[in-house]
Amino acid sequence: MMIITTMQDAIGRTPVFKFTNKDYPIPLNSAIYAKLEHLNPGGSVKDRLGQYLIGEGFKTGKITSKTTIIEPTAGNTGIALALVAIKHHLKTIFVVPEKFSTEKQQIMRALGALVINTPTSEGISGAIKKSKELAESIPDSYLPLQFENPDNPAAYYHTLAPEIVQELGTNLTSFVAGIGSGGTFAGTARYLKERIPAIRLIGVEPEGSILNGGEPGPHEIEGIGVEFIPPFFENLDIDGFETISDEEGFSYTRKLAKKNGLLVGSSSGAAFVAALKEAQRLPEGSQVLTIFPDVADRYLSKGIYL
């Protein structure tokens, strides 16, 4: 039994779930592995980022005991930063577009954060603009700005990716994962590519995202999808992008709950659909890795699981 003194101590070391053709149309002798990041204490992969950003902030002097952390977020990064901030007695302010789930906003407030909403029509760009305005007006504030900060992919390069190699070795055929800020995908993909040069890298986005050549537009899958190209993809040889509809993502989110007891968010459902498609186009015996980024409880009001 691991004894901890703060919830921050429980971040990481998440299990890996193995899927075979028992429940899904996966080719014979192939497997899909999902890193269950929804089991982090804050309920998402972003716990790793929150821990890393605040740790690096203290190391570089950007954060002191009097700092107020300000960040634009769809929710999970805010939850992660608020969770880690508790240990250091830091104030947190998060700017969230109105469209994102009320549960995530309630969790941030429960962890002591101030949540400020921006119009849905302005997207995450509006939240970024508002966050920068707040940072200019509030003394002793720090704006990590995950969408531009190289510490974002670095967090996963140094934490998530080494765990994956330790657990699964270097025989993986493909890495398939959702792209939101781009940090989880870029940091993990770069580490894996350095150790498994032949690994395929497949990004996952919802309809209404631009990575696969589409036009920006509305979508109900939360946590992935971009309005602009993340800056972390330079010199990263991505093999392709899989665009998943809300209907596909929600359908597999429900299946993962009912068939496997995996209570995950819709970005996990989308990632699994994409991983399944990748496994089906690869030779038998292939090993596909994906990430389940967050937990179901923050989306219950969306009616996804009914």
Swiss-Prot record:
InterPro entries: Cys_Synth/Cystath_Beta-Synth, P-phosphate_BS, TrpB-like_PALP, TrpB-like_PALP_sf. It holds the Pfam family PALP. CDD domains: CBS_like. Pathway: Amino-acid biosynthesis; L-cysteine biosynthesis; L-cysteine from L-serine: step 2/2. It catalyses: O-acetyl-L-serine + hydrogen sulfide = L-cysteine + acetate. Its EC number is 2.5.1.47. GO terms for cellular component: cytoplasm. GO terms for molecular function: cystathionine beta-synthase activity; cysteine synthase activity. Its cofactor is pyridoxal 5'-phosphate. This is Cysteine synthase. It comes from Helicobacter pylori (strain ATCC 700392 / 26695). The gene is cysM.
